[in-house]
A protein has these predicted regions:
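Glycine-/small-residue-enriched transmembrane alpha-helix faces in small-molecule transporters
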Residues: 1-45, 49, 149-173
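Cytoplasmic-side transmembrane-helix entry/capping segments in multi-pass membrane proteins
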Residues: 11-16, 68-78, 125-137, 156-157
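Residue-level recognition of pore/gate-forming positions within transmembrane alpha-helices
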Residues: 19, 46-50, 110-111, 133-136, ...
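Specific transmembrane alpha-helical segments of multi-pass solute transporters/efflux pumps
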Residues: 21-26, 54, 60-100, 105-106, ...
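Helix-coil boundary and interhelical linker segments in multi-pass alpha-helical membrane proteins
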Residues: 35, 92-98, 145-152
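Specific alpha-helical transmembrane segments that line the substrate/conduction pathway
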Residues: 40-51, 90-124, 163
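Hydrophobic transmembrane alpha-helices of multi-pass small-molecule transport proteins
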Residues: 53, 116, 125-146, 164-167
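C-terminal ends of transmembrane helices
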Residues: 53-64, 112-125, 169-173
Length: 173
């Protein structure tokens, strides 16, 4: 009963849909990279997000939000890290890595986000967070153990992990 009530909350279906789109994004991007440059695809993905959110804000008649001047540098850092560096690194990594391996490596974003929050921003860190990070890493290792996911190109893997780190920085800014 709690699960059904949880699904009725406004943000839960949106979060599930976002997770679905994120999960489908890597194989779709890998497929598109056969005919589009990594730079162009990275730009188009984020342009599409911006256009979609702009349309949503116009339709919902959302109040404009004002950013304090003191927050502007943090905002610019988040845009550069998560909106420029991360997608470009991901697309370049995907050009030389299989989608299955990239999908497993993308789990590192949550780990990087938590570690940066803990070390750089002095956020609380407890046993549950540590266990969650261990579960993420262990799950990626277990899923790749039979040799199904290939990590043959070290530079591609490092580019994807760099994208995860950049998104972790964005999440914390």
């Amino acid at each position: 009963m709690k699960v059904i009530n949880g699904l009725r909350q406004q943000g839960v279906p949106a979060a599930l849909f976002a997770a679905l789109l994120f999960g489908a994004g890597t194989p779709l991007a890998k497929w598109l990279l056969d005919s589009v440059s990594p730079w162009l695809l990275a730009g188009l993905l984020y342009l599409g997000s911006g256009v979609g959110l702009t349309i949503y804000r116009l339709i919902s008649r959302a109040e404009p939000c004002r950013l304090a001047r003191t927050e502007m540098l943090w905002f610019i850092g988040a845009i550069i890290s998560g909106g420029v560096i991360a997608p470009v690194l991901l697309m370049f990594g995907l050009t030389h890595a299989p989608a299955s391996g990239a999908s497993l490596l993308l789990n590192a974003e949550g780990v990087f986000t938590a570690l940066l929050a803990w070390f750089a921003f002095k956020e609380n860190f407890d046993r549950r967070i540590a266990l969650g990070m261990v579960a993420i890493v262990a799950g990626a290792i277990l899923l790749s153990w039979p040799g199904e996911a290939e990590f043959s190109d070290v530079w591609a893997s490092l580019a994807i992990l760099g994208a995860c780190l950049a998104w972790g920085i964005e999440n914390n800014l």
